[in-house]
Regions:
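Glycosyltransferase donor-sugar binding loop
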Residues: 1-2, 22-36
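A conserved mid-protein helix/loop that constitutes part of the nucleotide-sugar donor-binding site
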Residues: 2-16, 34, 72
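A structural motif in glycosyltransferase catalytic domains
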Residues: 6-13, 24, 117, 153
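Nucleotide-activated donor-binding/catalytic signature segment of Leloir-type glycosyltransferases, i.e.
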Residues: 33-52
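Conserved acidic donor-binding segment of nucleotide-sugar-dependent glycosyltransferases
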Residues: 47, 103-115, 121-127
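Acidic donor-binding loop of glycosyltransferase active sites
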Residues: 56-72, 82-83, 90
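Short acidic/histidine- and often glycine-rich active-site loop of Leloir-type glycosyltransferases
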Residues: 76-79, 90-105, 110
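A charged, aromatic-enriched C-terminal amphipathic alpha-helix characteristic of glycosyltransferases
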Residues: 115-116, 126-157
Length: 157
């Protein structure tokens, strides 16, 4: 059974980060979804389709963390000004095309392993998070609007 989203890395991150300082908001459903009820700092909302609720959850989040198989959801997170955190593309950690939108240390963080992840998240300052988020929002505004995507596609033809 495939676990492209690397929920094992998510669970390991939840376990290793300070539970008093870090909370996790989980949105989504699926057969590989772990049981998050074991963790008192994890808030599992399941599948959400109401954009108002999603907007509120993005508003209170500091980072968007998806260990593997990042897809279109990162564009939404970037539009909300959230830095993207994921693991480097490898044989074990597959990534979608949207992975290329993440610029390490500019609009997000790309981790090499779990120790790198824990260290870098733990050392992030609020100012760094704000700057990464502002850069993420700027990238979406400049490059990833539907108009620009159409223009880029047409330029190839």
């Amino acid at each position: 059974e495939n676990n492209y989203r690397r929920t094992d890395l998510l669970i390991e991150t939840i376990k290793q980060l300070n539970t008093e300082k870090y909370g996790f908001i989980i949105i989504g459903a699926g057969k590989n979804k772990p049981d998050f009820s074991l963790y008192n700092n994890v808030y599992d909302f399941g599948a959400i389709y109401d954009t108002n609720i999603k907007r509120e959850l993005f508003y209170i989040a500091d980072l968007y963390f998806q260990p593997g198989w990042v897809g279109l959801s990162i564009v939404e997170a970037m539009a909300y000004g959230k830095p993207i955190c994921t693991f480097i593309r490898s044989e074990e950690t597959k990534q979608c095309v949207e992975y290329s939108y993440i610029e390490n240390n500019t609009n997000g963080l790309i981790f090499t392993n779990i120790d790198d992840c824990i260290t870098r998240i733990s050392q992030l300052t609020n100012d760094e998070i704000k700057q990464l988020g502002a850069n993420a929002k700027k990238k979406v505004a400049q490059l990833l609007t539907p108009q620009n995507m159409v223009a880029n596609a047409l330029s190839i033809l």
